[in-house]
Swiss-Prot record:
Thiolesterase that catalyzes the hydrolysis of S-D-lactoyl-glutathione to form glutathione and D-lactic acid. The lineage of its organism: Bacteria, Bacillati, Cyanobacteriota, Cyanophyceae, Acaryochloridales. It comes from the Bacteria. Keywords: Hydrolase, Metal-binding, Zinc. CDD domains: hydroxyacylglutathione_hydrolase_MBL-fold. Binds 2 Zn(2+) ions per subunit. HAMAP family: Glyoxalase_2 (MF_01374). One of its GO terms (biological process) is methylglyoxal catabolic process to D-lactate via S-lactoyl-glutathione. The gene is gloB. Zn(2+) 1 binds at H54, H56, H113, D137. This is Hydroxyacylglutathione hydrolase. Zn(2+) 2 binds at D58, H59, D137, H175. It catalyses: an S-(2-hydroxyacyl)glutathione + H2O = a 2-hydroxy carboxylate + glutathione + H(+). Pfam families: HAGH_C, Lactamase_B. Monomer.
Length: 257
């Protein structure tokens, strides 16, 4: 399975998954149909599936146009997004699986950013080291999504699921927010040498207009404060009594950053 990262709008990423053997493709969160149609034409591939993580327009905005171009495409989304994702035919819940390119993705229910958000995790195949996580706006490189419909406790539970994935899991998040996320992270975790090194690397990459996605779970566990809410120094820094309170205060600080 080949993964093509397509930039869209000011900071979105769309991911086209390609199976060269069958010459079929799937797309994750097609915000804008045009770059997807262009990539499919370049590949000469037929679109067979749309994997949506949640209902926001900058993730599902291309669904209808892509369905017009490829009427047999199957649209997947979360069970609780019924009626909110254009063209949705499959309503997924925790523990479900979806198939593409002779691989099966495990579905995780990860509410917080929205009440219905899901993520897709492709475990590594035999002989491969890396798994692939498509997590929409739940986990970002260096950050996490705002809480529009969920609670801090829900988001901590959701991020815990993703944090528990193998460290050799690539994180394909849907926005190029990494530099600003790490700028915030340094204000609350300034003694973190891994974080300082990562910030320099990301700063250099963005100065060259290079993408910083994908990340990986191992790196996020070292440097992302929103996966480190149970670290004693962050609990102390935020004057919190519990990990969930620490997360909530970190999220509130980031919202004002």
């Amino acid at each position: 399975m080949q993964i093509h990262r397509l930039p869209a709008f000011s900071d979105n990423y769309i991911f086209v998954l390609h199976d060269p053997g069958q010459n079929i493709a799937a797309v994750v969160d097609p915000a804008d149909p045009q770059p997807v149609l262009k990539k499919l034409a370049e590949l000469g591939a037929e679109l067979v599936a749309i994997f949506n993580t949640h209902h926001h327009s900058d993730h599902v905005g291309g669904n209808r146009t892509l369905l017009q171009a490829f009427p047999n495409t199957v649209v997947y989304g979360g069970e609780q997004d019924r009626g909110r994702i254009p063209g949705q035919q499959h309503f997924l819940k925790e523990g479900d699986q979806v198939s593409f390119a002779h691989r099966r993705a495990e579905v995780y229910f990860v509410p917080g950013h929205t009440r219905a958000h899901i993520a897709y995790y492709f475990p590594p195949t035999t002989g491969e080291e890396w798994g692939e996580l498509f997590c929409g706006d739940t986990l970002f490189a260096g950050g996490c999504g705002r809480l529009f419909e969920g609670t801090p406790a829900q988001m901590v539970d959701s991020l815990s699921k993703l944090r528990n994935l193998p460290e050799t899991t690539r994180v394909w998040c849907a926005h190029e927010y990494t530099l600003k996320n790490l700028q915030f992270a340094l204000t609350v975790d300034s003694d973190n040498s891994h974080l300082k090194n990562r910030f320099k690397q990301v700063q250099n990459a963005r100065n060259l207009s290079q993408p910083t996605v994908p990340s990986d779970i191992g790196l996020e566990k070292q440097t992302n404060p929103f996966l480190r809410w149970d670290q004693p120094h962050l609990i102390i820094h935020t004057k919190s009594n519990t990990p969930v309170q620490c997360f909530a205060r970190l999220r509130g600080m980031k919202d004002q950053f």
